[in-house]
Amino acid sequence: SHEFGHYIVAKYFGYDTQIHYASTSWRYPDPNNPIVTGYPIAITLGGPIQTMFTGTIGIVILFLSRNSFFQADKLSFRQWFIIFISLFWLRQTANLCTWLGSYFVNGKLSSRGDEIHIANYYHLPNWTVVTTTAIIATLLLAIIIFKFIPLRQRGTFLSAGLTGGIAGYIFWLVLFGKYIMP
């Protein structure tokens, strides 16, 4: 859905667009028509805004139906689905972790990623957008985990989420994504 956020904005501005396994590419169909400089930043913003918007919808639904969560000893499929939608915010925390992780592995901070490009566009230090959104995400995730997930399911949720998140990253971004959606 993140890449679809880029795709929708690029299509809106008339670009030829393709979604790949880890990115969205766009080009203007008429090479003689200059690209307005504001469009690339709007397209870049489309992905993170879409992802955070989806997560925010989930959080709003969580709070609107909080009584059913507070009374539950074990969450229903519907409740887990709402939590899943809320966890779209997890991308922001994961981005900061992978950004810092690449520093510890490579000895330098990556200049790639939507949040870094957004910071550069607005002449902010590289860390500002990725760190600010990760802090917001971490606070929201703490509320989700400690307020809405019953204690008896919390440990399983955290261990399964961590294992699934790492496995999903490896399977999709490293191993199979490039073959399924080149």
PLM regions: where:
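Metalloprotease/metallohydrolase-associated module, dominated by Zn2+-dependent proteases
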Residues: 29-149, 169
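Tryptophan-centered motif/residue detector
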Residues: 9, 167-172
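Helix-to-loop transition at the C-terminal end of transmembrane segments
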Residues: 1-3, 96-100, 178-181
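Small-residue-rich helix-interface/hinge motifs
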Residues: 1-40
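Juxtamembrane boundary at the C-terminal end of a transmembrane helix
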Residues: 170-182
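Interfacial loop-to-transmembrane junctions
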Residues: 148-166
